[in-house]
Amino acid sequence: TSGETLNTSQWTVIPALTKSIVIDRAQNDLLLNINGMYQANNGAANNTGGITSTIGFFVNDQLIDVKPLYLDFQSSCSYRQFMIYGIAKNLSPGTHTVKFAIRNISAPNISGLTVTYGGPNSSCSSLSGFESAMSSTITINQPYSF
């Protein structure tokens, strides 16, 4: 729910993408982008169902936007690329901390199932670290008043 406080028992923060930003003007727009891949170690016999998760965009540990993700198990070591945007408007002037976090919602009951975000799953060989890395972009628009 928008406005909820970051609860690290429910959300996994991606530390490498945490950034401090400075807002100078009361009128502003913030565009957040995160992209990368995630991969499960499902086997060929588990090609039904998938994993439902969400990406949360947090400013000062308050949820400002959330977007769903779904990884469909269509083949062994299923993976999916994603590019997701979040927005915020009119943050107060000052320094703010932006965090991106992942929350797993549901997954099939498969013994030993693991999901890796931003890297290849250690049980799979179909992705490289380079192609599965996560990155983020933070764009701040602060129009001048003349």
Report residues per predicted region.
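Extracellular jelly-roll beta-sandwich "head" domains, especially the C-terminal globular C1q domain
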Residues: 1-146
